[in-house]
């Protein structure tokens, strides 16, 4: 088996710094996007509720038309 390679402390520092910066960026981006996604879900739920109500009314009208004929 090949022995582990010695890595420069400067390279290790750079790698861990990039990791920490990426985690910080991800946390900041997530906190920015989360409220927007919640708003989109809320609007979509309201739209779905409105469409379901329209479909229900349309279905009731269609059933009412068949009874009268």
Swiss-Prot record:
GO terms for molecular function: proton transmembrane transporter activity. The keyword Transport applies. Keywords: Acetylation, ATP synthesis, CF(0), Hydrogen ion transport, Ion transport, Membrane, Mitochondrion, Mitochondrion inner membrane, Transport. It is found in: Mitochondrion; Mitochondrion inner membrane. Induction: By UV light. Pfam families: ATP-synt_E (PF05680). The keyword Transport applies. GO terms for biological process: proton motive force-driven ATP synthesis. Its main location: mitochondrion. It comes from the Eukaryota. InterPro entries: ATP_synth_F0_esu_mt. One of its GO terms (cellular component) is mitochondrial inner membrane. The modification N6-acetyllysine is found at residue 34. Belongs to the ATPase e subunit family. Component of the ATP synthase complex composed at least of ATP5F1A/subunit alpha, ATP5F1B/subunit beta, ATP5MC1/subunit c (homooctomer), MT-ATP6/subunit a, MT-ATP8/subunit 8, ATP5ME/subunit e, ATP5MF/subunit f, ATP5MG/subunit g, ATP5MK/subunit k, ATP5MJ/subunit j, ATP5F1C/subunit gamma, ATP5F1D/subunit delta, ATP5F1E/subunit epsilon, ATP5PF/subunit F6, ATP5PB/subunit b, ATP5PD/subunit d, ATP5PO/subunit OSCP. Subunit e, of the mitochondrial membrane ATP synthase complex (F(1)F(0) ATP synthase or Complex V) that produces ATP from ADP in the presence of a proton gradient across the membrane which is generated by electron transport complexes of the respiratory chain. ATP synthase complex consist of a soluble F(1) head domain - the catalytic core - and a membrane F(1) domain - the membrane proton channel. These two domains are linked by a central stalk rotating inside the F(1) region and a stationary peripheral stalk. This is ATP synthase F(0) complex subunit e, mitochondrial. The gene is ATP5ME.
């Amino acid at each position: 088996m090949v022995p582990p390679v010695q890595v420069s402390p400067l390279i290790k520092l750079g790698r861990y710094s990039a990791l920490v910066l990426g985690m910080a960026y991800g946390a900041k981006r997530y906190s920015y996007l989360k409220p927007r996604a919640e708003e989109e879900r809320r609007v979509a739920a309201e739209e779905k509720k409105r469409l379901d109500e329209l479909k229900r009314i349309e279905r009731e009208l269609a059933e009412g038309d068949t009874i009268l004929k």
